Amino acid sequence: MDIQKQIEIIRRGTVDLISEEELKSKLQKKKTLKIKAGFDPTAPDLHLGHFVQLKKLKHFQDLGHEVSFLLGDFTAMIGDPTGKSETRKRLSREEVLENSKTYQNQVFKVLDPVKTKIVYNSNWCSKMNFEDVLVLSSKYNVARMLERDDFSKRYKAGQPISMIEFLYPLVQGYDSVAMECDVELGGTDQKFNLLVGRDLQREYGKEAQCVLTLPLLVGLDGSKKMSKSLGNYVGITETPIDMFGKLMSISDDLMWNYFELLTDLPLPEIENRKNGMAKKELHPKEIKTELAKLIMDQFSSPSENEEAIQEWKKIHNPKSRAVPDDVKEIKLGEEFFAETPEPLLVWVLSKLSFIPSVSEGRRLIKAGGLYLSEDKITDEKFPIQKGKEYLVRQGKKGKFLKIIS
């Protein structure tokens, strides 16, 4: 694949690429780049917030590059101070190792196990002696550390910052030195730490890595970043029915962000759906169902997911059980589409004698008496599109008609 096409794929959903020219140069010099993303195993499960980075690693993997999933089993015991207003509680070695095992099992739901290197930073960090730590510490200064927003705020507020927290970015940065990475990616909250790795590579006489930052996925609540501790997360090992239920709960505005970061749907197609919803040509629930399915299919089989979706709909639409088994079904002929490719539903229903007239159909809609499945029809100009099925109901317990267009 040519370099510009690779850059387009790599850039999708990213915030920073430092720098694009350097990345192009690396791609020109060697076919296979060393890519890494580090994950501190501070919680037992991976969720869709982690998946944003895993998906980008998969993009690199599909482009033929060498991908390393770095488990920060050593740095997890220090605790990342990023975004914290106070010193974090340290995890025990046992807790970290247990979480690491879980991460390692779950990551292969996304990455190709044959093409993925699982690396632990304790392999080099635990071998460093005090002299090595002093040499590493000499490569950076306190003034630079205080450029970090969270450190700066705590320092100005007179809140304590432990020396071990200053060491965290250095230890994380040293991972890039030890692994000789060409590209490191992480969330936007990790930008400072990623740039420290780039600086340290130069200090140790190595070629500086490119830095790629990705947005922090907003959680189900629509306001805070996805986090297990906040309860606004979707775990990548959740059952299909639970995953579908959670994804259907997100706001209509949030789903466009999920489409871009969590699926491979081309950006122009995402924009088409957005425009279709704005024009009321597409129903938000229909689009959200498609989004959920696209995400779920990356973790479970499509048939299993479809079964789960139908089961969820039955549970959450108890009225749908009242649909008669012998509901009348009509396949629309070409004559219905002779004058327009998308005839109005009320016109079709009047032609099929389901309602007395178009005007009666409009009156029913205004009165809230015409439904598609369990959803009230609110648009008098609701169009019928080819290749779809519509279950129409008149009144809460009225007659049904299934239209196949």
UniProtKB/Swiss-Prot annotation:
UniProt subcellular location: Cytoplasm
Q: Which PROSITE patterns match?
A: AA_TRNA_LIGASE_I, S4
- EC main group: ligase
Q: Which residues form the S4 RNA-binding domain?
A: 342-404
What does the record give as the reaction this protein catalyses? tRNA(Tyr) + L-tyrosine + ATP = L-tyrosyl-tRNA(Tyr) + AMP + diphosphate + H(+)
Main location per UniProt?
cytoplasm
EC number(s) recorded for this UniProt protein: 6.1.1.1
Q: Where is this motif: 'KMSKS' region?
A: 225-229
Q: Name one Pfam family in it.
A: tRNA-synt_1b
Q: How does it assemble?
A: Homodimer.
Function, please? Catalyzes the attachment of tyrosine to tRNA(Tyr) in a two-step reaction: tyrosine is first activated by ATP to form Tyr-AMP and then transferred to the acceptor end of tRNA(Tyr).
> Per its record, how is this protein called by name?
Tyrosine--tRNA ligase
